[in-house]
Amino acid sequence: YQGGFIWDYVDQALMKADEDGVLHMAYGGDFDDRPTDYNFCGNGIVYADRTISPKAQEVKYLYQDLRLIPDACGVEIENRRLFTDTSDLEFIWLALRNGEPIHTERFCARVNPGEREYVSVPAPAFTEPGEYVYQVSAVKKRAELWADAGYETAFGESGRVIGAVGAGAV
């Protein structure tokens, strides 16, 4: 797995008070310095105050060693690991309708390294109009030196709309 390296782990910014005395993280031209690189130094996966940014979740997704593609009936599991099957994981499949959970299934699946398998889940037919989102997570069955039991190592999501859905319903 080469490529996609993290250049800046943390944003490079300083605390600064605005005209109302409210503190915020400032960088680039925020100090009236010219020339400036503007937000070039604000591209880390954690903010300058060390809180996690949304980019960290994207990095986790891109680096995960499984590809999970859920749908209304199950999930396709692609094991991108080189030597290990998926027997160390439990999978949690979740269906949401208009943002509300409506069905969950937990299961185990053994997919060998470099292989893919579709696993069906015993879910009801979803026919009511609405926006449906299908999510799946792979979590550790047992604690490891680097992760607690239940730690999510991979995730996937897909969705579809059934029938006409008004903007207020979604």
Residue ranges and their predicted role:
Residues E90-P129, Q135-W146:
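Intrinsically disordered, low-complexity Pro/Gly/Ser/Thr-rich segments with frequent PxxP/GP/PP motifs
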Residues N112-V119, S158-G168:
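Short, surface-exposed linear segments at secondary-structure transitions and domain or protein termini
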Residues N79-R81, A125:
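Non-cytosolic beta-sheet module surface loops
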Residues G74-N79, V136:
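Short, well-ordered beta-strand segments enriched in hydrophobic/aromatic residues
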Residues E144-S158:
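Edge beta-strands of extracellular beta-sandwich domains
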Residues I6, V133-Y134:
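Conserved long hydrophobic alpha-helices within structured protein cores
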Residues Q135, K140, G163-V170:
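Beta-strand-rich N-terminal accessory domains
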Residues Y1-C73, R81-S87, I92-P101:
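Extended substrate-binding grooves/exosites of carbohydrate-active enzymes
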